[in-house]
Amino acid sequence: MNNLLLRSSADIIALVPAAGIGSRMNSDCPKQYLSIAGKTIIEHTLSALLDHPRIRHVVIVLNPTDTQFQSLEVVSDSRITTVTGGEQRADSVLAGLNHLAHVTGNDNCWVLVHDAARPCLHHDDLDRLLQLAEADEQGNMACGGILASPVRDTMKRGRVGQIIDHTVERQDLWHALTPQFFPLMLLRDCLSKALSQHANITDEASALEYCGYQPVLVNGRSDNIKVTCPEDLALAEFYLSRK
C-alpha cells in the first residue's frame, strides 16, 4: 500500500495492534491465533471490521517474529496491510499511525484502533462510534472517543496482601473497550508526545488525556469482550454464535 487515497470523508481506516504474545493465556500460541469455531480470533476480528461498509482498509501491526499471519487466508485480501510493531502496544500503535500518515493522502482522516483479541464487535456499536467523525465535520470539534461500558459490579480498591482498602464509588466508572476512534494526526501527535515523556499509556484515549483532551465515552455492548484468559474462549464462542 504505497498510497491509500480515501474516496470520501465517510471512509474509515482501522488499525489493529496484533504484536502481543498473550502471556496470560498459558498457550504456546499468541492468543490472536487461537481458534474459535474454525477460525482464528484475529480472523473473526477482521471480519467484524471489514464487513462494515465504511471501513475501507485495515492495517495490522505484527510482532517482528510473527510467522503465523502469513498462513491465514485473509492475508490475500487487498484491503489489508501489515506493518512491524514495537515492544509495547503503544509503540505498535504509533508505528501503525506513522505508516498511515505517509500513505493516506488525507491529513483530516480518522483512524479506528481495535484490539486483535476482541472478535465480538457488533456493527451497531461501531455505527454509534463513527458518528463522532460526523460531529467533527459539522463543526463540533470532536476530539474522538471510545466504546465503553458502565461498571455494574461493586468495585474494591485493594492494598498489599490482597486486603480490601475501601469500596470505590462505581458511579461514573466505565470499562474502556475498543474500538477507539480519533483523528489520525491528533492521535499520532499525542501518542508520540506521551511516549517521549515516558507517560503510562494503557490505551489510545490515555494518550489524548495526557495531552489535555477529553475523549467521549460511547456506550457499548458488554459482550464486546477481549479474549485474555483461557475461560474467555468459551464465552467468545458463545457470543459469536449469537451474532
Curated annotation (Swiss-Prot):
Per the UniProt record, the site (Transition state stabilizer) maps to R24, K31
What pathway annotation does it carry?
Isoprenoid biosynthesis; isopentenyl diphosphate biosynthesis via DXP pathway; isopentenyl diphosphate from 1-deoxy-D-xylulose 5-phosphate: step 2/6
Residues the record marks as site: Positions MEP for the nucleophilic attack: R170, K226
Q: Which residues does UniProt assign to the signal peptide?
A: none
Q: Which Pfam families match?
A: IspD (PF01128)
**Which stretches are transmembrane?**
none
EC main class here is transferase
Give the domain of life.
Bacteria
Q: What is this protein called?
A: 2-C-methyl-D-erythritol 4-phosphate cytidylyltransferase
Source species of the chain: Photorhabdus laumondii subsp. laumondii (strain DSM 15139 / CIP 105565 / TT01) (Photorhabdus luminescens subsp. laumondii)
> Its gene?
ispD
